[in-house]
Amino acid sequence: MNGSRATNAALLATLKAEWSEGSDVSVCVPAPYLGETAAALDGSGIQWGGQDCSAHSSGAYTGEISAAMLAEFGCTHVIVGHSERRSMHGESDALVADKAAMAMASGLVPIVCVGETLSEHDAGDTDAVVIRQLDAVIFKLGAAIERCVVAYEPVWAIGTGKTASPQQAQAVHARLRALLCSASTFGDSIRILYGGSVKVDNAAELFAQADIDGGLVGGASLKAADFVAICRAAR
């Protein structure tokens, strides 16, 4: 829940001016700014998406935003299961899977987030947690999981002063890759993004890992120069 009309306009203008082809970029913005984002990025080659969607197609769900509504604004992607949604809104694995299915039904690519908390990490439960979370989506979608993007967010490495090394991140990505390959013949081509405090100074080493296909960039995306540099590192 960051940004304003003025700061967003400046950020998007810089991104559009400085971005060049070589990496796929999707900017997921707060819903009130979707119209302005679509206008700003139209024809640029940069895609845009939503930060969440409802598990329902329509109806009396005041305050929720359907995947179909996002699609009407030209969105190509939507984030589901972000760690903040799971922790602050109590979203279950099953609900996240339902949201992913609804996104796909509306022609969007769901960016499915998985990741363990600090206590789960310290208890050695990383594998069990991320596999459980991703398994719920695979169970719901079946082989259609190949149309998703997966994002690994080590929650313990976000705002805690602790960091996941590229090697630690790669180890988890490799386990997620193995699970995806067991569910789809296209498992090797499903993109797995890393979302644990991606910054200019660690992006290149992270993206050099075999199973890290890009980044789910948080705070660094609020600074246009940093975000452009990270996008360049993903080429």
Where are these regions (language model features)?
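Active-site loop-to-helix "anion-binding N-cap" substructures in soluble metabolic enzymes
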Residues: 1-235
